[in-house]
Amino acid sequence: MALGTKHVLHLTKPSSRSSPLNIVIEPAVLFSILDHSTRKSENNQRVIGTLLGTRSEDGREIEIKSCFAVPHNESSEQVEVEMEYHRAMYHLHLKANPREVVVGWYATSPDLDAFSALIQNLYASPAEPGTAPLGTYPHPCVHLTVNTDVSSPLAIKTYVSSPVGITERLADSCAFVPTPFTIRDDEAVRSGLKAVAAPKNDPSRLASLFTDLQQLRRSTLELLSMIERVSDYVQNVIDGSSPANVAVGRYLMKCFSLIPCVEGQDFEKIFSSHLQDVLVVVYLANTLRTQVDIASRLNLLP
């Protein structure tokens, strides 16, 4: 018996193949989004933009490395996204970073509404025949939300989507599925974040760059401070003024086992020898740089 209605409700459960297991976000992306939010138009409640990055071969891990804002007009009735601007910026970005692709989009608002679903489907839709892809199809589209409201805590969330709704409303309907993410936190990033956060209490908000020797001195002082904290903790545990922690004790034993058993005088000789080698390498590198600079200037002479 044939049914007379043409309305079909689509309910697609997100599969493990279409949803990435993990999303890695570079801190520079979050700083860029916060910077974009300060230039928000008065007519719009949020800023949206394109997320760029790389995918693993199986598509189950996405690394978000950069982003750019995309102009749009949003009202209570409709939303207009300037996809030509998105196309031009993406092609310009490919000239500097040819390996990065579109992995999704971001918004400076935690709200998910029909317009969010419309933009999500726009980024996830396949390209027109004969044109270069500008979205994430056939891979899942990542939606990153950053709550930039100064009256609320900074909240970061990532989503992928699954189609849901009747046939006539598939373009502006989808179910956002939360996806786990991590923010990259390696040594280089941590050093940069410390330099950026250093002038947070300074009214001028100016951060000064340190020389290699100054940075070495700061790192040495931080290391001495951490050693003093560990020494005080161990002494307090021995005296019985602080409770013992088995996990901390095992971690300290593991760290101490990695330290070579060297006398103080021998260690000073080894360190001095290593420091002299480093200074020689730096001197030779500066000499070579000077020679190359002189040679390039001599080649310009008639």
From Swiss-Prot:
Component of the eukaryotic translation initiation factor 3 (eIF-3) complex. The eIF-3 complex appears to include tif32/eif3a, SPAC25G10.08/eif3b, tif33/eif3c, SPBC4C3.07/eif3f, tif35/eif3g and sum1/eif3i. This set of common subunits may also associate exclusively with either moe1/eif3d and int6/eif3e, or with SPAC821.05/eif3h and SPAC1751.03/eif3m. The eIF-3 complex may also include SPAC3A12.13c/eif3j. Residues 23-165 form the MPN domain. Belongs to the eIF-3 subunit F family. Pfam families: JAB (PF01398), MitMem_reg (PF13012). Keywords: Cytoplasm, Initiation factor, Phosphoprotein, Protein biosynthesis. The gene is eif3f. Component of the eukaryotic translation initiation factor 3 (eIF-3) complex, which is involved in protein synthesis of a specialized repertoire of mRNAs and, together with other initiation factors, stimulates binding of mRNA and methionyl-tRNAi to the 40S ribosome. The eIF-3 complex specifically targets and initiates translation of a subset of mRNAs involved in cell proliferation. GO terms for cellular component: cytoplasm; cytosol; eukaryotic 43S preinitiation complex; eukaryotic 48S preinitiation complex; eukaryotic translation initiation factor 3 complex; eukaryotic translation initiation factor 3 complex, eIF3e; eukaryotic translation initiation factor 3 complex, eIF3m. It is found in: Cytoplasm. InterPro entries: eIF3f (IPR027531), EIF3F/CSN6-like_C (IPR024969), JAMM/MPN+_dom (IPR000555), MPN (IPR037518). Its main location: cytoplasm. This is Eukaryotic translation initiation factor 3 subunit F. GO terms for biological process: cytoplasmic translational initiation; formation of cytoplasmic translation initiation complex; translational initiation.
